[in-house]
Amino acid sequence: MAGQAHLRGGQQHFHLDGIGAAGLVGLVPQVGQGLRIAQPARPGSDPQPLPYLWDEADQAHGAYAIEMEVLLSTAKMRAAGHAPQRLSKGPMGAMYWTAAQLIAHHTVNGCNLRPGDLLGTGTLSSESRETFGSLLELSEGGKRPIELPGGETRTFLEDGDEIVMKAHAVREGYRTIGFGECRGRIAAAR
């Protein structure tokens, strides 16, 4: 079924035109299989998701063995030659929802999700402090400043701060795959 994909359980489908898109459909799922791991168990006190969000196969292989890392570099740190400081490092596999569940929930009300659309996961956090995924969590709502090289502290981002996000797939028995990095710098309001 090269060049064509169907959404499970529904009437909608999309057709991919061109050899590049058709090749991508066949390539990405096979490459991604080595990254797929079991979804972590939900806390016993949490309710069972609705049937359209629950699939045993997705629970068995719906999470990804991807490590994410977030670093912070202030203008003062860059001027002094300091390396960015790591704020957080944690597993994407600890997400509460799988990618399939996010897509199902996004489209259940009729939203026409298309190939190439970006879908945000929200903050990725785990139980321990070093895996918290936001400055709000790390600074305990601004009450606990994060100490940086050169005596600076942060509870929230400031003008000139640069965030670096990195990710790589790591799983025993498989090669590590790096996804590169994404950088963003806070510019002063005009």
Short names for language-model regions:
Residues 3, 8-10, 18-114, 120, ...:
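Catalytic-core "active-site belt" of small-molecule-metabolizing enzymes
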